[in-house]
Structure formats: C-alpha cells, structure tokens
Amino acid sequence: YQAKDIFRKFGIPVPKGRVATSVDEAVKASQDLPGPPWVVKAQVHAGGRGKGGGVRVVKSLDELKQATSDILGRPLVTKQTGPEGKKVHQVLIEEGVNIDREFYLAVVIDRSKARPVMIFSQAGGMEIEEVAARSPELVLKQFIDPKVGWMPFQAKNLVYSLDPLPGADTVKEILSLMGALYRVFTTQDCSLAEINPLVITREGKALAIDGKINIDDNALVRQKELKALDDHR
C-alpha cells in the first residue's frame, strides 16, 4: 500500500483500499469500499505474493474474514522472501476490479547502458524475468536520456505497439501514467518503480492494481519520509 500511496500523490490511478491489522479492522475497511467482491492482499516488502497465497479474491464477508484470518500473523513465502518467508502484520482490503487486459510497466536502471529504461509488456501479472526468457518479443524497452527525461514519443512507441489498440481515452490515460511513473522514479530516487499489473478495466479505465518501489540506499539521506517506511520486522 505504501507504493500505491506514492502513486496516488503523482496522479497514478489505483483501486480504493484500506489497511487492516485484524479481522475486525478488515470488516470495517470493507464497509467503506465498493463491493463485494473485495481483494485481500498480504502486506510485505516482497513481490510474488499472489503465487504465495498472499492475494485472495473474496465475494462475501465470511470469505473476507476467513482470508484475513488465514493471512495475518503467518509467514508468507515467495521467490523474494527466501524459504523462511516474511510474517504478515497487515493486509490491504481493496475494491474488486473488472479487468479486461493486464500489462507490465516499470522504470529501472539498466546498468549496462548506465541509464533508466522504461519496460512495457502485454504479459502483465507475471514475473517479467520469466516473460523475457520465454517470450522476449513481448518485452518492449525505451531507454531514457537522463538529461532529456521521458519524452512523449517514447510513450507512444510503447502504447501504439498494442494489438488491439485500446480506445483513444484509454490510450491517453496510459500515456499520462507512463510520464507519472517516470516522475515517481526520478523524484523518489528509485532504482525500480514497477506496476504489475497495470490493467485496463472493462469500463476502459487504466489502473495500477499492484506496485513496487525500490529506493536507492545511497539516496535515503534525502528521502527521510521514505526511509521511515522501512519495515525491519
């Protein structure tokens, strides 16, 4: 949820959600959100939560209570946590979303070229390393000159590669979202700013369903607010 809070500040649309630390809080959170359905998401500083059982779609209050009880207080094991896992102290309760299409979008430092690169793929919701190994043609890149920044033509190069191409309003939303993600990357001193998946809803809206931000450790001295978000548990 911390990454989504940052996304929201930069105008990146995210689903409505509330954080809960108990079953009772989860129930109260759901009452402030559209639904059912809702989505219960384990909150740990690691990716791959869906495959680890840390993301559950629920269609009733009873299912929400059960999912929250199952997740809270237990270690979540993913590829990024190691075999010991990370204990879950919080869950995020989110509104359900009618998903039409899923994409992967990220800005990361390419160390071989010593510059940022925007990565975009139609294979959203999956580990991008797996996609790159299996279907490299699905992973598109635009390298960014730090002196110039993210340019509109680069966003169009990525978005207009989509087949089928979304509607005009949706295209505008994605183009704007790409620029916003690059601003997150630069202003927050990120080594990674990732949206996975970025979705188009059945209503034609672009939404950042899940996100991850890694901050360059060398920049934490000037990112005191972000340093305070670190979870040492």
Locate predicted features.
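Acidic, glycine-rich loop-and-beta core segments that form the ion-binding/anion-interacting portion
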Residues: 202-233
